[in-house]
């Protein structure tokens, strides 16, 4: 590519934002309930792997359900660790990620069909676009306009006061993590659908970027979605700059690859302390 293509940028950015958007909404749901969730990466990755495996064996719809199911299983394990056994949220999140990395690596080596380009049956891209870009508005309406959303908000802000009002924080958090598993499952399924194959480690830190996006958005659905879209734009820009003979000449590709992540770190550093986390985040 010899020059910067604005039309191509606008075409590719939504697809690059989509997995982040789904994962960020999942992370926001659980963090709004008071659970620190650094396990988005692992839930996405296991969904990528299981979606690919089951799509090859049984077709794309079963693959999608399998990927969501695998992410939900890890989400429920996360719930048991944090709510039943009171394991530290950071430690349990890291444990979930390690389990997902190990399981996906094993399955990738055991079933080699899933990493061949074009072997994985795909659902229409429109399905994922509609699901992802409608979700922030739906989640905003849920949090602000429904009893369930207000309970979620209350538990995340003050679990003790929520108990006094007759709300069970443990039940709310289980349901929140269930939703997180579904959203991360969709995110992982999209990555595999978009790539047409499974590659070990293909989430490439997107779960952590999604976590950063929801923090940048102040734990609010619409601003968090905008942060995801901004990251998708940066990712699309760096891909074009890598291929540009004029702008990318002589500059290592690793530099361009790091730009979206560097921009995220700078944005987080600039907003550190300004965005208020849910007051009950990390509390039993």
Predicted regions and their residues:
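Helix-loop-helix "hairpin" substructures at the membrane interface of multi-pass membrane proteins
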Residues: 125-199, 221-226
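Transmembrane helix-bundle core of multi-pass membrane transporters
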Residues: 89, 93, 100-149, 198-200, ...
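Hydrophobic core segments of alpha-helical transmembrane domains in multi-pass membrane transport
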Residues: 23-24, 48-52, 101-105, 129-141, ...
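Membrane-interface helix caps of multi-pass small-molecule transporters
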Residues: 28-29, 53, 57, 73-76, ...
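Short loop segments and helix-boundary regions at transmembrane helix junctions
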Residues: 32-36, 74-125, 147, 204-205, ...
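Cytosolic-side transmembrane-helix boundaries in multi-pass membrane proteins
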Residues: 138-143, 157-171, 241-284
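Transmembrane alpha-helical segments in multi-pass inner-membrane proteins
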Residues: 198-261
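Single transmembrane alpha-helix segments in multi-pass membrane proteins
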Residues: 8-58, 64, 69, 73-90, ...
């Amino acid at each position: 590519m010899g020059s910067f293509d604005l039309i191509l940028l606008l075409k590719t950015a939504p697809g690059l934002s989509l997995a982040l958007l789904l994962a960020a909404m999942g992370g926001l749901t659980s963090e709004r309930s008071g659970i620190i969730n650094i396990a988005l990466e692992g839930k996405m990755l296991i969904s990528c792997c299981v979606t690919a495996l089951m799509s090859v064996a049984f077709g794309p719809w079963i693959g999608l359900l399998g990927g969501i199911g695998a992410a939900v299983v890890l989400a429920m394990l996360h719930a048991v660790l944090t709510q039943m056994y009171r394991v530290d949220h950071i430690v349990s999140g890291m444990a979930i990620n390690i389990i997902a990395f190990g399981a996906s690596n094993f399955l990738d080596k055991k079933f080699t069909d899933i990493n061949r380009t074009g072997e994985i049956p795909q659902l229409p891209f429109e399905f994922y676009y509609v699901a992802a870009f409608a979700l922030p508005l739906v989640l905003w309406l849920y949090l602000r306009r429904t009893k369930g959303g207000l309970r979620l908000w209350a538990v995340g802000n003050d679990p003790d006061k929520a108990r006094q009002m007759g709300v069970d924080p443990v039940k709310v958090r289980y349901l929140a993590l269930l939703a997180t598993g579904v959203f991360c499952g969709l995110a992982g399924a999209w990555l595999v659908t978009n790539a047409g194959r499974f590659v070990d480690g293909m989430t490439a830190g997107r779960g952590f970027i999604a976590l950063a996006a929801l923090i940048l958005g102040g734990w609010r659905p619409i601003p968090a979605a905008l942060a995801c879209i901004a990251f998708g734009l940066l990712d699309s820009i760096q891909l074009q700059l890598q291929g540009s003979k004029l702008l990318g000449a002589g500059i290592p590709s690793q530099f361009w690859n790091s730009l979206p992540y560097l921009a995220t770190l700078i944005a987080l550093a600039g907003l550190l302390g300004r965005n208020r986390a849910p007051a009950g985040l990390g509390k039993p």
